[in-house]
C-alpha cells in the first residue's frame, strides 16, 4: 500500500515537473515572438536603434513581466521602461504592437477586424507616417481588416476606404471621403 502511494507520488511529481517545463518553454516562445513583433514596430516607426525587451520573473509563485526599451546611441546603450523612453509616442506604438501580437498569438484565433480609436495620438508628426505604414504592413501581412477612428490625415491616407463622419443637427452623417 505504501509502495503504491510512493509510486503515485513520484508519478505526480514527474507530471508537475513536465507541466512546469512545458509552461516555461511556452512562456519563453511567447516572449521571443512578442519581442520580435514589437521591436519590428518600433524599428518601422523610429529607426533601427531601438529594441523591445521583456523580462520575466517569478514573484510569489507567479510569473510577472517587465517591459523595457533598449536604445543605442553610438557606443552607448540605454535601457528604460517604455513610459520613460522618449515620450508617449513610444508607449502608443508598443501598445499598438502588443494588441496586434495578442490578437495573432491567441488560440483559437480571434477573428474579425482590428478596431482602433486614435491609435497614435502621442506620436509626433515626424513619426506618424511610420505608424501608418506599420499598420498597413501588419494588417496586410495578417490579412486583418483595420477599422480606425482618427483625426490624423497621414493615418487615413493608407486606408483603402475613408469615411467622413459629421454631426449635423444631432445626427451622424457618413459620407465617402476622397482627398482633394
Spans of model-derived segments:
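A short, glycine/Asx- and small/polar-enriched loop/turn
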Residues: 60-65
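Flexible glycine-/small-residue-rich
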Residues: 54-56, 69-73, 98
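GG-anchored amphipathic helix commonly corresponding to the ABC/SMC/Rad50 NBD signature/C-loop
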Residues: 71, 88-113
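Walker B catalytic acidic pair
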Residues: 117-119
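Charged, surface-exposed helical/loop "interaction arms" that form contiguous linear patches used
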Residues: 1-56
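Short pre-catalytic strand/loop immediately N-terminal to key active-site residues, enriched for Gly-Thr
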Residues: 79-85
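C-terminal lobe/lid and adjacent interdomain/linker elements of RecA-like ASCE P-loop ATPase modules
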Residues: 129-180
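Conserved D-loop/post-Walker B switch-helix segment of ABC ATPase nucleotide-binding domains
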Residues: 110-111, 122-133
